[in-house]
């Protein structure tokens, strides 16, 4: 596993993930800034490139939902921030096969909140709306259905607090 900045100087899986996140940040920039005519063209270009990257990598991250320092470790299915009310904090590490979903699809559009410095293990399912605190580690193949406080380690299906950091 390489550092995300070092990945830009290599080819392969890490380059694709770095390119995905970089394109996502460009899309966020052109979405949020004042729209001049040429900015609309660039936003459309980065949106189409983002859609192509979703099909190519299997990762779906909505613009303006993820804080800085997102670290994607391997390619694989991830669905993060499909709604604008979802927020994933800074310096979050997310492994493959992570799914964010609703407990009940007919309930209102309440959001997720994932705090800063979180580690989300492979195969994790987070059914919300939930609030996950800062510095939380979620073990592999866990199912999170309830709020998690700051500074703890959770695992299991359903996820239970194993220990506090």
Features from the language model and the residues they span:
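Structural signal for interior beta-strand "rungs" in well-ordered beta-sheet cores
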Residues: 55, 59-155, 159-162
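Terminal amphipathic alpha-helical/low-complexity segments used for targeting or macromolecular assembly
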Residues: 1-57
């Amino acid at each position: 596993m390489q550092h995300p900045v070092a990945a830009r100087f290599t080819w392969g899986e890490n380059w694709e993930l770095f390119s995905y996140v970089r394109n996502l940040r460009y899309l966020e920039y052109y979405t949020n800034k004042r729209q001049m005519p040429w900015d609309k063209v660039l936003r459309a270009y980065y949106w189409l490139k983002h859609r192509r990257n979703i099909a190519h990598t299997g990762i779906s991250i909505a613009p303006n939902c993820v804080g800085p320092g997102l670290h994607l470790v391997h390619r694989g299915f991830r669905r993060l921030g499909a709604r604008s009310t979802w927020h994933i904090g800074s310096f979050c590490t997310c492994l493959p096969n992570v799914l964010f979903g609703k407990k009940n699809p007919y309930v209102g559009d309440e959001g997720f909140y994932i705090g800063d410095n979180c580690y989300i293990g492979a195969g994790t399912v987070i059914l919300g709306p939930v609030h996950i605190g800062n510095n939380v580690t979620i073990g592999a193949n866990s199912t999170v259905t309830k709020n998690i406080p700051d500074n703890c380690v959770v695992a299991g299906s359903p996820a239970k607090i194993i220990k506090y950091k």
